[in-house]
Amino acid sequence: MLTKRQVKILQTIVEEFIKTNQPVGSKRILELLDIKISSATIRNESAILEHEGYLEKQHTSSGRTPSTKGYRYYVDNIMKLDSADYTRLKIYLNQLLDLRKYDIDKTINYASEIISELTKMTAVVIKKQNIKNIKLKKIELILLSEFLASVLFIFSDGDVQNKMFNLKDISLSDLKIAIKLFSDFLVDVKLDEIDQYLNDLKHQLSLSIKQYDYVLNTFINTILESKNEQKETHGMRYMLENPEFNDTNKLKNAVKLVEQLSPFDWFNIAYESNKNMNKIAIKIGNEIDQINDDISMIATELKIGNSSTVLTLVGPKRVDYNQVNQLMNLIIEIINAKEN
């Protein structure tokens, strides 16, 4: 359990680092704190916070930066909604949107563009129609040539979707195994219940074939995107502008994450907010995966009539969580008002 003084120091470091992207030293903390405290005490408390995993020491400077654990503590225990800021942002957003001009879908898309611009984060909007009565009925493999195969997904409403596979990228035997496992787990399952089976399916795939992640994402994308899944992405350019992604490999991993996550993944991120009785889900650093420790995701699910839409913001771990949280709450409020 952190003391009040440690909480204050952690808050100061998080908020200053978000603003400056520079490690925060004891001298700067002393300037920012509104309590009387010595530099020696700040250094001692910062060392304790580092030892407990809330801060990280930067070897190139005397300052410290927040860790994933530090950001998580800030989001869960320190961050508060500022009513004055919220009101100001609400007026600004309503003026920009001019709600009379747009239907709900256009309002969400335009709002996501605005939020992307305000936060300098990438916005991903996934819309899912009501598919509760549609089932996957059959998966078939058609070998077209020595190097090309087609997988057909047949649905209870008569729809058939086709996905081509280059057999240089995945072996025919692995493809056959994947089809068998998908058929065993998902045939005659309603599409809106597929997520209940995916963890077990993924486990079996991982034991049976090499490229199980690729196959899982490709198959699920084909199944769900074919049933009126709509995806809009705004502000990918902001990935290039954030210094966290100056490293080419980190940038590639971030872009790959945004492009390859299946609709199920996006909804699963937002689902956690409903499970925890919160409107907004926040994932930070290695809570997403080990490769993308510099990334954060903030998501909310908007239920509109018979459809659901997930709005997710993706950016560096060093984002203004308070501002993003307020903007996401505003979108929820605006969409609810629009629908009613």
UniProtKB/Swiss-Prot annotation:
Molecular function as annotated in GO: DNA binding
Keyword DNA-binding: no
InterPro entries named among the record's database cross-references: GAF-like_dom_sf, HrcA, HrcA_C, WH-like_DNA-bd_sf, WH_DNA-bd_sf, WHTH_transcript_rep_HrcA_IDD
GO BP, sorted A to Z: negative regulation of DNA-templated transcription
Keywords recorded for this protein, A-Z: Repressor, Stress response, Transcription, Transcription regulation
Superkingdom classification of source: Bacteria
Role summary: Negative regulator of class I heat shock genes (grpE-dnaK-dnaJ and groELS operons). Prevents heat-shock induction of these operons.
Similarity comment text for this entry: Belongs to the HrcA family.
Protein's UniProt name: Heat-inducible transcription repressor HrcA
Gene source species: Mycoplasma capricolum subsp. capricolum (strain California kid / ATCC 27343 / NCTC 10154)
Gene name of the encoded protein: hrcA
